[in-house]
């Protein structure tokens, strides 16, 4: 039995508990949590199913004979190879997909069972007496649990039960391949709002509730992350604009201070060479971006200041119009684009080698930037408007124009941008967006920008540790290692290098 302590059950201990082992419970639950954090495929059998449920917040019938009236004897006296009752399998479940069955005859050797189901799981098979016989957490986690013992049937030659183990091995092989690929490529998430949380005591060196941390990056096999110095849009008078500059400067400095605390595990990256060096040293890399050109204030000289502070891109606006351009969201006119000052900002960013980010920009702004920028541009966190009609997403026409420009569109993992029913948005939907964007723009012009700690997060991808799931889903769709190399960082690094080298090329031409 699972130990009677309330922390495991979520309810009070019951007198009919049988033999327990607190040491085994502690070990099993620790292994289960560590495996789940890393998205390792898991198959739980009998007690394993029960542990899954209590580990993630469910409860158990602690003694079926006295707590649940039943027509089924769940402790059979027959041998394990003898099936003693049927189970009904939910048609749309992973278990039905694996076995190809809607009814299975199973054995039964338990006196505990699921009472209250843990959040994030669904029951996928029932016994005739309404006892849950199987659960799964797909696509949130790669976890399946069964109350019966398929290993006994499999050892006796049952080919249907054997499919469960083949499924687990295949999932493990794909997981292993995903990790191997990540060890050989450079993986970058181009947008997080994590610095907003520093003032609340959050640290990138601690694995807590925030989506971004060094530990989670390692679990998800992510090499680098852009930390955005985000500034809310405020009043546009001289005094307010100057305060925005000062606030942004402090935010950027806070990124340096935070990374310095964990210099043995991470570092600031300005170029691809920095990223390669840090990866070879076994460290994570943090690039710096600015979200909202309001941070520039009224003076173009601030762009040079930010360049000297290591800023690699500036998102021209956020959810409201500013002195640079019109926003896609709260705007006077989405067809309007760059202001005269905005055109000067684009020119100066080109001159200094800072990437121009058009996420959050109106369509008018997008087309103006395409027209006036001499360098490729990026959308650091935007998805497909064809699949989810939201003003923050890019139309197919925009995606094609971005590709022609040589730029890159980075898939955003914010549920509202991914699915018309946000709560249902999952990693599977995200890969559908990615797939569509690649079909429209081409494999050389798409990447990933999660928007973690700023609204991003979907079922199956709620933090850095879950990013390996994107890779797994892409492998299952047939994407090659070379494809993944481009999507996860190669495309963005190509644009960044071209933009950074443009000022040097211009200087050589003048000489």
Predicted regions and their residues:
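Amide-donor transfer/coupling interface in amidating biosynthetic enzymes
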Residues: 21-40, 65-179
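Histidine-centered catalytic micro-motifs
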Residues: 106-112, 146-150, 187-194, 311, ...
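Short, small-residue-biased leader/transition segments that mark boundaries at the very start
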Residues: 2-3
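N-terminal hydrophobic targeting/anchoring segments and the immediately downstream early-domain regions
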Residues: 177-333, 389-448, 452-511
């Amino acid at each position: 039995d699972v130990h009677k302590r309330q922390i495991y059950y979520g309810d009070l201990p019951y007198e009919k508990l049988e033999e327990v082992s607190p040491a085994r419970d502690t070990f099993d639950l620790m292994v289960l949590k560590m495996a789940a954090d890393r998205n390792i495929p898991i198959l739980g059998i009998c007690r394993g199913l029960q542990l899954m449920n209590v580990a993630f917040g469910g409860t158990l019938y602690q003694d079926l004979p006295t707590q649940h009236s039943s027509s089924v004897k769940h402790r059979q006296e027959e041998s394990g190879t003898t099936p003693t009752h049927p189970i009904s399998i939910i048609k749309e479940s992973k278990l039905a997909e694996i076995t190809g069955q809607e009814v299975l005859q199973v054995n039964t050797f338990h006196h505990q069972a699921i009472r209250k189901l843990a959040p994030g799981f669904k029951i996928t098979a029932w016994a005739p007496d309404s006892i849950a016989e199987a659960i799964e957490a797909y696509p949130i986690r790669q976890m399946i649990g069964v109350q019966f013992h398929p290993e006994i049937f499999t050892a006796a030659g049952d080919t249907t039960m054997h499919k469960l183990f083949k499924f687990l091995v295949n999932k493990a092989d794909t997981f292993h391949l995903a990790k191997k690929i990540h060890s050989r490529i450079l993986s970058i998430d181009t947008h997080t709002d994590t610095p907003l949380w520093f003032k609340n005591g959050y640290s990138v060196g601690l694995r807590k509730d925030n989506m971004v941390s060094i530990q989670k990056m390692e679990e998800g096999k992510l090499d680098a992350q852009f930390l955005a110095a985000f500034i809310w849009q405020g009043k546009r008078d001289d005094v307010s604009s100057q305060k925005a500059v000062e606030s942004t400067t402090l935010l950027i400095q806070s990124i340096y201070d935070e990374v310095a605390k964990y210099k043995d595990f991470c570092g600031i990256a300005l170029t691809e060479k920095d990223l390669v060096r840090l990866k070879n040293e076994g460290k994570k890399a943090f690039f710096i971006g600015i979200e909202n050109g309001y941070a520039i204030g009224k003076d173009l000289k601030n762009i040079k200041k930010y360049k000297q502070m290591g800023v690699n891109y500036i998102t021209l606006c956020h959810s409201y119009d500013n002195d640079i351009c019109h926003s896609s969201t709260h705007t006077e006119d989405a067809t309007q684009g760059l202001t005269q000052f905005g055109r000067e900002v684009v020119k100066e960013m080109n001159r200094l080698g800072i990437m121009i980010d058009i996420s959050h920009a109106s369509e008018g702004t997008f087309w103006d930037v395409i027209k006036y920028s001499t360098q490729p541009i990026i959308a650091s966190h935007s998805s497909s408007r064809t699949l989810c009609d939201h003003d923050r997403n890019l139309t197919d026409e925009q995606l094609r124009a971005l590709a022609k420009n040589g730029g890159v569109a980075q898939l955003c993992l914010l549920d509202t941008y991914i699915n018309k029913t946000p709560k249902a948005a999952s990693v599977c939907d995200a890969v559908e967006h990615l797939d569509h964007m690649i079909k429209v723009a081409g494999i050389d012009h798409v990447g990933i920008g999660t928007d973690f700690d700023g609204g991003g997060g979907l079922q199956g991808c709620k933090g850095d540790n879950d990013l390996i799931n994107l890779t797994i889903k892409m492998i299952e769709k047939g994407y090659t290692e070379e494809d993944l190399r481009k999507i996860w960082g190669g495309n963005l690094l190509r644009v960044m290098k071209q933009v950074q080298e443009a000022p040097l090329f211009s200087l050589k031409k003048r000489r």
